[in-house]
Amino acid sequence: MDQTEQYKSVMSEIIAKQSVILGPDMAVMRAKKVSNIRIGDDGAVVEIIGDPIEALNSLIDTYVELSGQIVKNSIGPIFIKYPEVKQTK
């Protein structure tokens, strides 16, 4: 899996995890507000525009605005599955 696909997978899993916490409508609505990603109706990330690290951080930030530390704790295990995906430059 190439790097962009890994970032899309990580972000899609984050959205899925937030769907459980916030409900699918709210989780997808918040994700669609992130300008550097495109989200399918099913909540999957279909495109990353620009830097994937910035896109990932923007997605995380949009959920942190709502739920704070709970979000950070809930997505931690996702990053264990994708050791090559970085959150910062």
Where are these regions (language model features)?
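Long, compositionally biased intrinsically disordered regulatory segments in eukaryotic proteins
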Residues: 1-89
